[in-house]
């Protein structure tokens, strides 16, 4: 636990407000070089996402084609019709990435799993930091183009599907997360600097509406091109 963790949660709306949330719905466009490399260019360019706040579950629709959606938990990835009829599924989905490299193409269930766990994390952060099993620690600050930013190191519990067990969250002067450093082994494991901006208030909760994932150099600085993942969120609704 850390003072910075509490500051970040409060800046994004506070735990009392978040505890009233059951689901998060978002309309968004997800593009970038990663998807083409994996064989799915523009597959997530115009999607609606529904994520649970009380458990790790998420659904994309449409998925791949009209009339299809996903239903994903850490242990089970399902592609189904809009009325809930399973079309195909994979249990223990993370194991299906064993032996992959950056260039290994994905099938549709790989795509569903990666995009699912990643977006669930994005939509539930930073509030998940208050859950049992998460460990947080403030570490030395970072200078980003002359701006000094505080940093929060977060260790994730084993039962949460995420990019990697330990991630570094950069915090701006408003207490908002503006960058995350991680690597994602299921997507090749390249060191990543994931930038967040254009934070907006949606019913009392602040979320970044623009995200860009870039390659991170050994000195911690980001390589601006190419953009591996670009996420632009048009609307967020809580229920």
What does each model-identified segment do?
Residues 34-43, 57-64, 120-135, 156-162, ...:
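Short, solvent-exposed secondary-structure boundary motifs
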Residues 64-107, 216, 221-238:
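Catalytic loop of the DD-peptidase/beta-lactamase superfamily, centered on the K-T-G motif
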């Amino acid at each position: 636990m850390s003072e910075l963790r509490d500051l970040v949660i409060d800046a994004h709306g506070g735990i009392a407000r978040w505890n009233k949330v059951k689901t998060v719905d978002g309309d968004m466009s997800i593009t970038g070089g990663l998807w083409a490399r994996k064989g799915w260019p523009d597959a997530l360019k115009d999607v609606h996402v529904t994520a649970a706040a009380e458990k790790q579950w998420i659904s994309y629709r449409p998925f791949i084609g009209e009339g299809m959606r996903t239903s994903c938990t850490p242990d089970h990835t399902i592609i189904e019709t809009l009325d809930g009829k399973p079309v195909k599924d994979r249990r223990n989905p993370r194991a299906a990435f064993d032996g992959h490299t950056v260039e290994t193409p994905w099938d549709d269930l790989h795509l569903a799993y990666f995009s699912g766990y990643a977006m669930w994390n994005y939509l539930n952060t930073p509030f998940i930091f208050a859950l049992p099993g998460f460990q947080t620690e403030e570490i030395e600050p970072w200078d980003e183009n002359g701006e000094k930013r505080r940093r929060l190191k977060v260790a994730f519990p084993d039962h949460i599907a995420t990019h990697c067990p330990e991630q570094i969250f950069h915090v701006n002067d408003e207490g908002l997360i503006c960058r995350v450093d991680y690597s994602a082994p299921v997507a090749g494991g390249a060191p990543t600097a994931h930038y967040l901006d254009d934070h907006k208030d949606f019913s009392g909760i602040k979320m970044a509406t623009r995200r860009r994932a870039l390659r991170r150099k050994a000195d911690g600085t980001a390589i601006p091109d190419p953009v591996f993942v670009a996420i632009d969120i048009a609307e967020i609704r809580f229920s």
